[in-house]
Regions:
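Radical SAM/AdoMet-radical enzyme domain recognition
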Residues: 5-8, 12-30, 39-181
Protein backbone atom coordinates (compact mmCIF):
# COMPACT_ATOMS: atom_id res chain seq x y z
CA UNK A 1 0.00 0.00 0.00
CA UNK A 2 1.23 3.47 -0.89
CA UNK A 3 2.34 5.66 2.01
CA UNK A 4 0.41 8.91 2.18
CA UNK A 5 1.97 12.30 2.85
CA UNK A 6 -0.04 12.49 6.10
CA UNK A 7 1.43 9.21 7.42
CA UNK A 8 4.96 10.21 6.40
CA UNK A 9 4.63 13.64 8.03
CA UNK A 10 3.22 12.14 11.24
CA UNK A 11 6.13 9.67 11.44
CA UNK A 12 8.70 12.43 10.84
CA UNK A 13 7.08 14.72 13.41
CA UNK A 14 7.01 11.91 15.98
CA UNK A 15 10.70 11.11 15.48
CA UNK A 16 11.80 14.74 15.52
CA UNK A 17 9.54 15.53 18.52
CA UNK A 18 11.39 12.85 20.53
CA UNK A 19 14.92 14.14 20.04
CA UNK A 20 15.73 13.53 23.71
CA UNK A 21 15.06 9.80 23.20
CA UNK A 22 17.31 9.54 20.15
CA UNK A 23 20.86 10.43 21.06
CA UNK A 24 22.47 9.04 17.91
CA UNK A 25 24.87 11.55 16.40
CA UNK A 26 23.48 11.09 12.91
CA UNK A 27 20.56 9.52 11.09
CA UNK A 28 19.94 7.70 7.83
CA UNK A 29 16.46 8.15 6.41
CA UNK A 30 16.17 4.90 4.44
CA UNK A 31 13.68 4.57 1.57
CA UNK A 32 13.11 0.92 0.66
CA UNK A 33 10.31 -1.37 -0.36
CA UNK A 34 8.70 -1.62 -3.72
CA UNK A 35 10.40 0.90 -5.94
CA UNK A 36 10.88 4.20 -4.08
CA UNK A 37 11.63 6.29 -7.18
CA UNK A 38 8.13 5.54 -8.51
CA UNK A 39 7.04 7.89 -5.71
CA UNK A 40 9.63 10.59 -6.43
CA UNK A 41 7.17 13.47 -5.94
CA UNK A 42 6.23 12.21 -2.47
CA UNK A 43 9.86 11.43 -1.61
CA UNK A 44 10.95 14.90 -2.69
CA UNK A 45 8.26 16.42 -0.46
CA UNK A 46 9.31 14.19 2.47
CA UNK A 47 12.99 15.06 2.09
CA UNK A 48 12.28 18.79 1.80
CA UNK A 49 10.10 18.61 4.91
CA UNK A 50 12.81 16.74 6.83
CA UNK A 51 15.46 19.32 5.95
CA UNK A 52 13.23 22.27 6.84
CA UNK A 53 12.03 20.73 10.10
CA UNK A 54 15.49 19.68 11.26
CA UNK A 55 16.71 23.21 10.54
CA UNK A 56 13.68 24.92 12.10
CA UNK A 57 13.98 22.85 15.28
CA UNK A 58 17.77 23.26 15.38
CA UNK A 59 17.83 19.46 15.56
CA UNK A 60 21.24 17.91 16.18
CA UNK A 61 20.78 15.75 13.05
CA UNK A 62 20.55 18.76 10.72
CA UNK A 63 24.25 18.65 9.83
CA UNK A 64 24.55 14.87 10.04
CA UNK A 65 21.95 13.02 7.97
CA UNK A 66 21.67 10.96 4.81
CA UNK A 67 18.87 9.84 2.56
CA UNK A 68 19.42 6.25 1.47
CA UNK A 69 17.70 4.49 -1.41
CA UNK A 70 17.63 0.96 -2.71
CA UNK A 71 16.26 1.12 -6.25
CA UNK A 72 15.80 -1.22 -9.19
CA UNK A 73 17.32 1.58 -11.29
CA UNK A 74 14.77 1.41 -14.06
CA UNK A 75 13.71 5.06 -13.93
CA UNK A 76 17.01 6.33 -12.49
CA UNK A 77 17.68 8.60 -15.48
CA UNK A 78 14.22 10.18 -15.47
CA UNK A 79 14.11 13.97 -15.30
CA UNK A 80 12.36 14.05 -11.89
CA UNK A 81 14.77 11.57 -10.29
CA UNK A 82 17.79 13.41 -11.69
CA UNK A 83 16.45 16.75 -10.41
CA UNK A 84 16.02 15.18 -6.96
CA UNK A 85 19.56 13.75 -7.06
CA UNK A 86 21.05 17.10 -8.07
CA UNK A 87 19.20 18.87 -5.26
CA UNK A 88 20.20 16.37 -2.55
CA UNK A 89 23.44 14.81 -3.84
CA UNK A 90 25.62 15.62 -0.82
CA UNK A 91 23.19 13.77 1.46
CA UNK A 92 22.43 10.75 -0.76
CA UNK A 93 23.37 7.10 -0.78
CA UNK A 94 21.81 5.22 -3.70
CA UNK A 95 22.20 1.55 -4.44
CA UNK A 96 20.89 -0.01 -7.62
CA UNK A 97 19.85 -3.63 -7.32
CA UNK A 98 21.12 -5.73 -10.19
CA UNK A 99 21.44 -9.46 -9.74
CA UNK A 100 24.41 -10.09 -12.01
CA UNK A 101 24.38 -11.27 -15.59
CA UNK A 102 21.37 -10.80 -17.84
CA UNK A 103 20.54 -14.49 -17.51
CA UNK A 104 20.71 -14.42 -13.70
CA UNK A 105 18.95 -11.05 -13.26
CA UNK A 106 16.11 -11.91 -15.62
CA UNK A 107 15.38 -15.19 -13.81
CA UNK A 108 13.49 -13.31 -11.10
CA UNK A 109 13.12 -9.71 -12.24
CA UNK A 110 10.45 -9.83 -14.89
CA UNK A 111 8.19 -7.04 -16.08
CA UNK A 112 4.61 -7.76 -15.14
CA UNK A 113 2.56 -8.82 -18.14
CA UNK A 114 -1.17 -8.11 -18.30
CA UNK A 115 -1.83 -11.79 -17.58
CA UNK A 116 0.13 -11.59 -14.31
CA UNK A 117 -1.93 -8.60 -13.17
CA UNK A 118 -5.02 -10.77 -13.75
CA UNK A 119 -3.56 -13.66 -11.73
CA UNK A 120 -2.63 -15.80 -14.77
CA UNK A 121 0.79 -16.91 -15.95
CA UNK A 122 1.90 -15.13 -19.13
CA UNK A 123 3.08 -16.96 -22.20
CA UNK A 124 6.85 -17.42 -22.10
CA UNK A 125 7.32 -15.27 -25.19
CA UNK A 126 5.50 -12.38 -23.42
CA UNK A 127 7.84 -12.39 -20.42
CA UNK A 128 10.55 -9.74 -20.45
CA UNK A 129 13.28 -9.38 -17.88
CA UNK A 130 14.33 -5.96 -16.63
CA UNK A 131 18.12 -6.35 -17.01
CA UNK A 132 18.44 -4.22 -20.16
CA UNK A 133 16.39 -1.42 -18.57
CA UNK A 134 18.54 -1.45 -15.42
CA UNK A 135 22.00 -1.83 -16.94
CA UNK A 136 21.61 1.19 -19.22
CA UNK A 137 21.51 3.41 -16.09
CA UNK A 138 24.61 1.93 -14.42
CA UNK A 139 27.13 4.32 -16.08
CA UNK A 140 25.19 7.43 -14.97
CA UNK A 141 24.79 6.04 -11.46
CA UNK A 142 28.51 5.25 -11.14
CA UNK A 143 29.41 8.67 -12.54
CA UNK A 144 27.26 10.33 -9.87
CA UNK A 145 28.20 7.91 -7.06
CA UNK A 146 31.67 6.47 -7.77
CA UNK A 147 32.33 3.41 -5.66
CA UNK A 148 28.64 2.79 -5.01
CA UNK A 149 27.67 -0.77 -4.25
CA UNK A 150 24.88 -3.02 -5.38
CA UNK A 151 22.71 -5.67 -3.80
CA UNK A 152 22.42 -9.06 -5.43
CA UNK A 153 19.53 -11.25 -4.31
CA UNK A 154 20.16 -14.98 -4.49
CA UNK A 155 18.20 -18.10 -3.70
CA UNK A 156 19.33 -21.71 -3.74
CA UNK A 157 18.51 -21.88 -7.47
CA UNK A 158 20.97 -19.04 -8.16
CA UNK A 159 24.08 -20.54 -6.57
CA UNK A 160 25.54 -21.70 -9.92
CA UNK A 161 25.45 -18.08 -11.15
CA UNK A 162 27.17 -16.32 -8.22
CA UNK A 163 30.76 -16.28 -9.50
CA UNK A 164 29.75 -15.37 -13.04
CA UNK A 165 27.43 -12.64 -11.73
CA UNK A 166 29.99 -11.02 -9.43
CA UNK A 167 32.60 -10.99 -12.21
CA UNK A 168 30.04 -9.48 -14.59
CA UNK A 169 29.15 -6.72 -12.13
CA UNK A 170 32.85 -5.98 -11.65
CA UNK A 171 33.19 -5.64 -15.43
CA UNK A 172 30.39 -3.03 -15.35
CA UNK A 173 32.42 -1.00 -12.84
CA UNK A 174 30.55 -2.11 -9.72
CA UNK A 175 33.23 -3.14 -7.26
CA UNK A 176 31.13 -3.49 -4.11
CA UNK A 177 28.65 -6.35 -4.24
CA UNK A 178 26.44 -7.18 -1.25
CA UNK A 179 24.53 -10.44 -1.39
CA UNK A 180 21.05 -10.84 0.09
CA UNK A 181 20.02 -14.46 0.56
CA UNK A 182 16.42 -15.57 0.17
CA UNK A 183 15.71 -18.49 2.46
CA UNK A 184 12.08 -19.16 1.64
CA UNK A 185 10.51 -20.39 -1.57
CA UNK A 186 9.44 -17.52 -3.78
Amino acid sequence: ERMSWEIAKAAIDYILDHEEDMKEESVIWDFIGGEPFLEIDLIDKICDYLKVEMYRRNHHWFNSFRFSFSTNGINYSSEKVQKFIKKNHSHLSIGITIDGTKRKHDLNRIWKAKEMEQGMLPKTEDEKGSYDDVVKNIPLWLEQFPGAGTKVTISSADIPYIKESVLHLYSLGIHEVNINCVFENV
